[in-house]
Amino acid sequence: MAPTAASIDEYISTFPEATQEILQELRRRVHAALPDAEERISYQIPTFAVDGQYVIYIAGWKHHVSIYPIPGGDGELDADLEPYLSGQGTIKLPLKQPVPWDLVDRAIAARVAERVPQIRR
């Protein structure tokens, strides 16, 4: 993982170009699902928040990128995510494989649908 960065741009810039492209696309897709997301670094990784409370995190690593947390409880989504799950609610996307963007979008949408109502009640 990259050292603590002051911004998401700075964080992403510490990775190789191919990883930067994936992280930027993840960032774009989070904003597409959550247009009013606030960006910050929390726990040394990019964090997207609403009303000051986290919704979703992304992170870059040497061999993969991660998205977390991902909710469970949707049988079809859970089954589709199973090959990418690592630990409780973490998706690991290996850098040597094509990113399953449709699945990523579904996972992000599920997290937004779960978390935002909790924040805004």
Which residues fall in each region the model found?
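Charge-dense, helix-prone N-terminal extensions
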Residues: 1-121
